Amino acid sequence: MADAFGDELFSVFEDDSTSAAGAKKDKEKEKWKGPPGSADKAGKRLDTKLQSESASGGKNKRDLDVEGTDEPIFGKKPRIEDSINEDLSLADLMPRVKVQSVETVEGCTHEVALPADEDYIPLKPRVGKAAKEYPFILDAFQREAIQCVDNNQSVLVSAHTSAGKTVCAEYAIALALREKQRVIFTSPIKALSNQKYREMYEEFQDVGLMTGDVTINPTASCLVMTTEILRSMLYRGSEVMREVAWVIFDEIHYMRDSERGVVWEETIILLPDNVHYVFLSATIPNARQFAEWICHLHKQPCHVIYTDYRPTPLQHYIFPAGGDGLHLVVDENGDFREDNFNTAMQVLRDAGDLAKGDQKGRKGGTKGPSNVFKIVKMIMERNFQPVIIFSFSKKDCEAYALQMTKLDFNTDEEKKMVEEVFNNAIDCLSDEDKKLPQVEHVLPLLKRGIGIHHGGLLPILKETIEILFSEGLIKALFATETFAMGINMPARTVLFTNARKYDGKDFRWISSGEYIQMSGRAGRRGMDDRGIVILMVDEKMSPTIGKQLLKGSADPLNSAFHLTYNMVLNLLRVEEINPEYMLEKSFYQFQHYRAIPGVVEKVKNSEEQYNKIVIPNEENVVIYYKIRQQLAKLGKEIEEYIHKPKYCLPFLQPGRLVKVKNEGDDFGWGVVVNFSKKSNVKPNSGELDPLYVVEVLLRCSKESLKNSATEAAKPAKPDEKGEMQVVPVLVHLLSAISTVRLYIPKDLRPVDNRQSVLKSIQEVQRRFPDGVPLLDPIDDMGIQDQGLKKVIQKVEAFEHRMYSHPLHNDPNLETVYTLCERKAQIALDIKSAKRELKKARTVLQMDELKCRKRVLRRLGFATSSDVIEMKGRVACEISSADELLLTEMMFNGLFNDLSSEQATALLSCFVFQENSSEMPKLTEQLAGPLRQMQECAKRIAKVSAEAKLEIDEETYLSSFKPHLMDVVYTWATGATFAHICKMTDVFEGSIIRCMRRLEELLRQMCQAAKAIGNTELENKFAEGITKIKRDIVFAASLYL
C-alpha cells in the first residue's frame, strides 16, 4: 500500500464519500465544553454549538485549506539503507583517533589517545637517573605523568587545585634543560606569569620572561610567557620556535573563557607537530575529548592522567542567614546529608523576612553584614584560620573587611613583620604615591591580619598582600573569585558570603564548577587534616539546587572559538596555512564532529522503530490524526483569547472552579481564592499584558510541600490523599474556567477547612458525569472579537469532519490513534536528527568567515583573491584592540592633527573595559576626536551589515568606552596619580590596568606606523608611551 505519511492535510477534504450530507448533527446543543484541545482521546467532548450546514461548506473550505500544516507530518517512508550510506561518507569526516586505557593504581585514571593506525606501545620505565629528584614521595598521578614525559609523550594532567600538578611541569622543564632543548611555559595572565617566573627562576636559573609588559632574558632555555605572546611568535615565524621541544600550558581550562579562550586554541593549532605538550588543568569531565583533539591535530599520542583525589578532604557547611550555627551538608567522604540541608533551610524559613534579600540576591535587613562578622569571629575562636572570604563584587570585599575593624588576629611580633614587608614593598614608590588613600588605608588592616584582594587594588598592594598571605601574616583575606585562579595560595577555610552572583546579565546561583574552583582553596596539604568550606545562604534553595551546587561536577572544557579579524588577516599573510584550515582544525569543530556517530546511531534506531510500527488502514488513520492535530492547534488559539486579562479577570472571583495545567503537571480542578498583578515585570521585558497571578486552592502532593516554596508544588498522585494548598498560578496555566462557583471558608489556614473544599469539588464532578460545564467564550464571556469567531467556525468545520469520519466511533480508535501519534513523533525525531547531521557535517562558522572576508575586501584590507593589502599588513600588527577601526583611523589621517596626549587619550577608549556610572564631561579637544572615531566606527558597522555580518551598530559603538579619556589625558600631561584618582569613580587598580593595556596598544601602534613608513606618527605614539609610563602606574612587579 502507498505510504500515507506523505499526504498534506488538505487531503482530508477530498474524501467526499462521507460528505456534509451525512453530518452527525444529532449532538445536543449544550454548554461550551472547552476548546477542542481539551478533548479526551476519543474526541467525545468536541461538540461545540454546531452551526448550520454551511459551516463545513464552500465558504470555509478555503479557510481550512490555508490552515493546513506547512509540511507533511510524516516524510517519505525512511529506508535504513539511506542512513547507512550516510554513515559511509561520514568515515572521511571523523577524526581518526582511538583511546586505550592504561592500567594504574586506584584514585587515578590513565588513558591515551592514539592515531587510529598506531598500536599502543606501553610506556618504558626510566633508564638511568631522573631529570629531577623530589624530596617527597610522589602521588600516583604525578608518577604516571612523569613517566609519560620520560617517554617523550604529550600528557594532560587534570587534578584539583593544590593537588601538585606543577611537579609534572617542573619535571618536563628539567628534562628539556638536561637534553639541551628549549621549553616554553605559558600561563593565562601576566600576574601568574610573573609568579611562575619567580618559582622557575629559583629552581632552574636559565629562565626568561616575556609578557608584553616585561622581557627578561629572552634567550634563556626556559621561557615563561603569556599565551598571547606565544601566538604572535608563531604568526611571526620566530626563530625560537625551531628549538622548542616542550610547551607547557598552565590552567588549560581557561580555554573556555569566552573572550580570550580562542587564543589558546589558535596557539595549539599553530604549534608544529614535533613539539610535545604538558597541559595542566583543573578537573574537567571531558579531559579525554581534549586529548583526542590533540592527537587528531598533531598526529601524536596524548595521555590523560585524571584524578579526583584531594590530599586534604573537605567538609562543606551551610550557614543560613538569621541562624547562628553551621550545618554540615557534605562530609569529608563526599556524602550529601539531606536532613541537615533541610534543617538549614527550615532555619532560613523561620528567620523569615529578616533574612530575605531583595530580588537581586543582596542581603536584606540588618543581619547581613553581622553574619560575616559572626562567622569570621567563630572561625578564629575555633582556630580554623587562615580563611579566604569570597565575595562577588569589589565593593562587598571592602565593606566586609571594614566591618572587621574591631578584630585583631596578629601578635605584636607579626605586626612588626607586616610593617617591614609592607614598607620594603612600597619603597620603590615616590613619596607622593606612598600617601595615596588606598596605600594608607590598607596598612592598619594588614597589621591586624586582615587583607583585601580584588582587581581594583593597586597591583603593588595586591602582590604585597599575596606575599603576606603566603607567609601566614594574613589570617582573613577578603577576595573576589579572581584569587581562585592559578596562584597556589591555599587556606584552611573558605567562606562564601553569598551563593548568588551577578554575571553581567543577571543574578544567578554560582555554578558547581565555580564552587569547585573556589572551594578548592580550602585545606593545606601536609598542614590540615581537612579543609572547611562554609556557604552563606540568604535565600531559600531547593535540595536539588543545593546538591547540584555542592556535589555537582566541574564545568566541561567547551571551546569558545570565534573568528577575529586579526586571526583572519594573519592567516592570509602566512603562506602555509589559511583561515579555513584554522576553522576545520579547531576544538570547536572537533567537538561537533564527535557528536556525529551518536546522531547517526539515533537516526538508525528511530528509522528501525518507525518501520516496525504497522497501522491497519494507515491512510485513513493519518487523515483522522491530522484533523485532531488541527483541532488541538485551534484549541490553543481559543485558549489564548480566553486568557487575555480583559476577558477572564471578571470571572476569576473567589470560589470559581478552574482547571490548572502546566507543562508536566496536571492539577485538575481547583478553586480560585484571589488574583493579583505580578509586580516585578520589567517595563521593557517584551511582555505586553502585565502578568496576573491567580491564587488557586489545589490538591498537591505532601512531599512537594515539605521543603520548598508553594511555587514548586506538584499535583497529588491518583492513589494519594494529598493536601489542599493555595498555589500561585499564572493566568495562562488555567486550561479551563467553569460556570460553577463554590462557597469557600473565610479562613483557609486550618487544614480541615481546606480539605472541605476538596469534598465540594468532588461533589461537582459527580453531578456532571459528562464533564463540568465551562464558560462559553462568546455567550458567557462576551468576547466579540472577529478573530475568535473565525477560529470557532474553523473548529466547527473540523469537528464536523471528525464526527463524520468512519474512525470516530471505531472501537479500536484508541489503539490505532496512539500508534499513529507515536509514529508521527518518530518522524519528527528523524527529521531533526537529520538536520543535526547536516549541521555537524558543515564546517561551522564558514559563512561568518565569508562575511568577514567580504568586509576586508570592501575596506581594502585584502583583494578578491585573498591576497593581503598594505592596510591588512598594518592591521596584523594590532592584536590588543579593534584592528579594523584603528587601521581605518590611521589611513584616514585621524591621528595626524592630534597631539601625543590627545592620541593617547583617544586610544584609551579601546582598552578600558569596565563599567563606570560617571560619563566624563569632555572638552572639545577630546570630544572632537571621539566623534570622528565614532563616525569611522559607524562606517565599519555599515559595511559589516552590508556584508551580511550580524552586527548591532549601537552595541558596537558602546564597546568603545570614553570613561577614562580625560583621566588618561591629564595623566599624560604630567598630573599626579592622586589627582587623577579624584577625577573618576573607577578603582585605582582598574585605572592602572587600563594604562598598562594602553602602553601595550601604543607599542603595537608604533609597529603599525612603522609598517607604513610614517615616522611622524610612530614618534607620536612612542612619545605617548614615555608620557604615561611613569611612577606607580608602571611600578615593577615584586615577583621580578
UniProtKB/Swiss-Prot annotation:
Means of activity regulation: Activated when MTREX is incorporated into NEXT complex an the nuclear RNA exosome complex.
Annotated Helicase ATP-binding domain residues: 146-302
Record location of the Glycyl lysine isopeptide (Lys-Gly) (interchain with G-Cter in SUMO2) cross-link: K24, K356, K682, K721
Residue spans crossing the bilayer: none
Top-tier EC class: hydrolase
PROSITE patterns: HELICASE_ATP_BIND_1 (PS51192), HELICASE_CTER (PS51194)
Signal peptide per UniProt: none
Keyword ATP-binding: yes
Motif DEIH box per record, residues: 250-253
Residues engaged in binding ATP: I137, A159, H160, T161, S162, A163, G164, K165, T166
Enzyme Commission identifier(s): 3.6.4.13
Locations listed in the record: Nucleus, Nucleoplasm; Nucleus, Nucleolus; Nucleus; Nucleus speckle
Start-end of Basic and acidic residues biased regions: 23-33, 41-50
Origin superkingdom: Eukaryota
Any one cellular-component term (Gene Ontology): nucleoplasm
Residues the record lists as Phosphoserine modifications: S38
GO biological process: DNA damage response; maturation of 5.8S rRNA; mRNA processing; RNA catabolic process; RNA splicing; rRNA processing
The keyword Zinc-finger appears for this protein: no
Gene Ontology terms, MF aspect: ATP binding; ATP hydrolysis activity; RNA binding; RNA helicase activity
Keywords: Acetylation, ATP-binding, DNA damage, Helicase, Hydrolase, Isopeptide bond, mRNA processing, mRNA splicing, Nucleotide-binding, Nucleus, Phosphoprotein, rRNA processing, Spliceosome, Ubl conjugation
Region annotation (Disordered) ranges: 16-77
SMART domains for this protein: DEXDc (SM00487), DSHCT (SM01142), HELICc (SM00490)
Catalysed reactions, semicolon-separated: ATP + H2O = ADP + phosphate + H(+)
PANTHER family given in the database record: ATP-DEPENDENT RNA AND DNA HELICASE (PTHR12131), EXOSOME RNA HELICASE MTR4 (PTHR12131:SF7)
Protein name: Exosome RNA helicase MTR4
Origin organism lineage: Eukaryota, Metazoa, Chordata, Craniata, Vertebrata
